[in-house]
Swiss-Prot record:
Monomer. Binds 3 Mg(2+) ions per subunit. CDD domains: NUDIX_DIPP2_like_Nudt4. This is Diphosphoinositol polyphosphate phosphohydrolase 1. The lineage of its organism: Eukaryota, Metazoa, Chordata, Craniata, Vertebrata. The active site is at 69 (proton acceptor). Residues 17-142 form the Nudix hydrolase domain. The gene is NUDT3. Its cofactor is Mg(2+); Mn(2+); Zn(2+). Changing residue 91 to L: Induces a strong decrease in Ap6A and [PP]-InsP4 hydrolysis, while it only weakly affects PP-InsP5 hydrolysis. It catalyses: diphospho-myo-inositol polyphosphate + H2O = myo-inositol polyphosphate + phosphate; 5-diphospho-1D-myo-inositol 1,2,3,4,6-pentakisphosphate + H2O = 1D-myo-inositol hexakisphosphate + phosphate + H(+); 3,5-bis(diphospho)-1D-myo-inositol 1,2,4,6-tetrakisphosphate + H2O = 3-diphospho-1D-myo-inositol 1,2,4,5,6-pentakisphosphate + phosphate + 2 H(+); [phosphate](n+1) + n H2O = (n+1) phosphate + n H(+).
Length: 172
């Protein structure tokens, strides 16, 4: 199923969820700093770069394309962290790790909509995401659990469902 957006065709899975892809863009393989971008809707808020998949596009290809458009970075695509479901917004997002190897001075969203980017330590990224993007904050928790659950070998997560109400209850 597809729906036309101003600049792209949206694709949906069999359950009617929008198919999305995103990357946790790390400065190095140590995965200590991650790149976030300003939201197009709320420029004072930070988000994980990602977006809708195009028809017939593989999730990994969409993830790399989206981070180049939104964050102006290229790199080495790594493991799939998981497939995250946002029940409130009806999205399913494939989230990958990307180790940044090239940072573009000017990129599509910086030129077109003035999007900004900034490096964050993981704990700080979680803090800035947890209130307005709890599903995105959960990407980092899953990343951590993947390492600890298998002695440093990442465990590929299946679908995670986070509703705004359940995720906010754990925040103090």
């Amino acid at each position: 199923m597809m729906k036309l957006k101003s600049n792209q065709t949206r694709t949906y899975d069999g359950d009617g969820y929008k198919k999305r892809a995103a990357c946790l863009c790390f400065r190095s393989e140590s995965e200590e700093e991650v790149l976030l971008v300003s939201s197009s809707r709320h420029p004072d808020r930070w988000i994980v770069p990602g977006g809708g998949m195009e028809p017939e596009e593989e999730p990994s290809v969409a993830a790399v394309r989206e981070v180049c458009e939104e964050a102006g970075v290229k790199g080495t695509l790594g493991r799939l962290v998981g497939i995250f479901e946002n029940q409130e917004r009806k999205h399913r997002t494939y989230v990958y790790v990307l180790i940044v190897t090239e940072v573009l001075e000017d990129w599509e969203d910086s030129v077109n909509i003035g999007r900004k980017r900034e490096w964050f330590k993981i704990e700080d990224a979680i803090k800035v995401l947890q209130y307005h993007k709890p599903v995105q904050a959960s990407y980092f928790e899953t990343l951590r659990q993947g390492y600890s659950a298998n002695n440093g070998t990442p465990v590929v997560a299946t679908t995670y469902s986070v509703s705004a109400q359940s995720s906010m209850s754990g925040i103090r």
